[in-house]
A protein has these predicted regions:
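Residue-level recognition of transmembrane alpha-helices
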Residues: 114, 135, 155-156, 169, ...
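C-terminal transmembrane helix pair
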Residues: 188-198, 330-432
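Hydrophobic alpha-helical transmembrane segments
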Residues: 7-22, 52-57, 103, 132-148, ...
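Membrane-embedded alpha-helical segments and adjacent helix-loop junctions characteristic
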Residues: 56-146, 296-361
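Membrane-core helix-loop-helix motifs of multi-pass transport proteins
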Residues: 140, 144-231, 364, 392-426
Length: 432
């Protein structure tokens, strides 16, 4: 037990430090982040000292219910469909059209961007939306000669709030909900109102914070974008739409969500290749899409899952569940999960809390799960470490010479995040 506890603690500390300082290196122009290597190294040490390969493999690939591999398939498939649309320029064209459509003043632009990001993140991955739209916002604000800070902060917060409404909005939703066989529609019925109320409250807070900056005049200049490939864009949107509908219906027909997303991605790739063959053009979009996939999440999730498995084996997660008790479940699990996400990142936190919830009393388990899901989403904007997107988001801002420090992130994030978290958890009490 001691070995598993020490290795897990040191690994989490290593993940925190390498994430905060964005430790990475390059080999032949390819950038490699170190955080996932730390997680993988810790997992290997635990695997050869505290776990047997057979029990590790059995849990990793269990046929009944959900397992880490199925969750990774679901997340990567949905991410790749979103990246495919991004490679075609769909998000950039849509954002450009939206911003120019409401170009009279910054207030209408601010409202439009918030709604735009909120809608997109519901049906795609919040991380993909953040990483896709951030460079566009920076370019647009530079051309319009306005401060990008109000739009960048609202984009990040909106993406990590409205991602709560559907299971597919965030890999943490996928992991926690799927681990307890919560269906798509069942999840939506519980999370719809808390997400809506939280989104409205945080928008009001954001508006009050940035109201002064939004009074400056705007001088919009259309960005020069490459011509959109209409047939492939229609194909990508059709696949995404059909996939989303099937995910909604999956609970009624006992269709595995990971299988729906994987088949959808396979169909998209196959039909795209047929299109390229028929038009005698290079399938560069497919290649670029596959290269941009967040593959680093695979060793990271499996590594952190291995650490949690060791902690579970030696009763650590059960002791935490016993310590939490059965009173004040919503706020205990919600607040501690949000805090934990900023210590070890929200994906490992979800793996940890999945095990803790599993040991909670049956009469409070659902409340604990949904509270942890809320904490995993809103906790992402309390500090950059809360989510992988936060770390990458800050690195993009540094690349474009935007002055926005770690403390700035915490200041804005906590100002909006703390009341948002309280509203979300309070409204959850109405449904569970």
């Amino acid at each position: 037990m001691l070995v598993a506890l020490v290795v897990s603690s040191v690994t989490c500390l290593g993940v925190i430090l390498t994430s905060i300082f964005n430790v990475r290196f390059e080999i032949k122009g390819k950038t490699f982040h170190v955080y996932w290597m730390v997680a993988l190294l810790g997992a290997l040490i635990v695997l050869f000292s505290s776990l047997s390969l057979s029990e590790w493999w059995q849990v990793l690939t269990k046929s009944g219910g959900i397992n880490p591999i199925k969750i990774l398939v679901l997340f990567l498939s949905m991410s790749l469909i979103s990246i495919f649309l991004d490679e075609l320029g769909f998000f950039a064209h849509l954002a450009n059209w939206t911003m120019l459509r409401f170009k009279k003043n910054q207030i209408s632009l601010f409202v439009t961007l918030y709604i735009f990001v909120s809608l997109l993140t519901m049906f795609t991955s919040n991380d993909i939306i953040i990483l896709t739209l951030t460079p566009f916002i920076l370019f647009f604000c530079k051309n319009a000669k306005i401060s990008p800070i109000p739009y960048l902060v609202s984009e990040f917060i909106a993406a990590n709030t409205w991602s709560m409404i559907f299971i597919i909005g965030n890999p943490t939703n996928i992991y926690l909900a799927s681990s307890f066989n919560i269906a798509f529609t069942e999840y939506f019925k519980v999370m719809a109102i808390p997400t809506l109320l939280t989104g409205l409250v945080e928008f009001l807070i954001l508006f009050l914070i940035f109201m002064g900056k939004l009074k400056d005049p705007i001088q919009p200049n259309p960005l020069k974008l490459e011509k959109e490939n209409r047939p492939l864009t229609i194909l990508g949107l059709s696949v995404l739409g059909i996939c989303t509908i099937l995910l909604v219906l999956s609970g009624y027909f006992a269709l595995p969500m990971y299988l729906i997303s994987a088949v959808s991605l396979g169909a998209l790739v196959l039909l795209s290749l047929i299109y390229f063959i028929c038009t005698r053009t290079k399938p560069s979009v497919v290649g670029h899409t596959l290269r941009r996939a967040p593959y680093e999440i695979i060793p990271f999730v499996i590594g952190m899952f291995t650490l949690v498995l060791a902690l579970e084996k030696y009763g650590v997660t059960q002791n935490i569940a016993n310590f939490f008790g059965s009173s004040g479940t919503t706020f205990v699990y919600g607040l501690t999960s949000a805090f934990s996400a900023n210590l070890i990142n929200n994906i490992p936190m979800s793996v940890l809390y999945s095990s803790i919830c599993n040991f909670s009393s049956e009469n409070i388990r659902l409340r604990a799960i949904y509270s942890s899901i809320i904490g995993s989403n809103i906790g992402a904007f309390l500090s950059p470490l809360g989510a992988l997107a936060g770390i990458m988001w800050l690195s993009i801002l540094k690349k474009y010479d935007v002055k926005f420090s770690y403390l700035d992130f915490v200041k804005y994030g906590c100002t909006v995040g703390v009341p948002s978290l309280l509203v979300a958890l309070s409204s959850l009490l109405l449904f569970i």
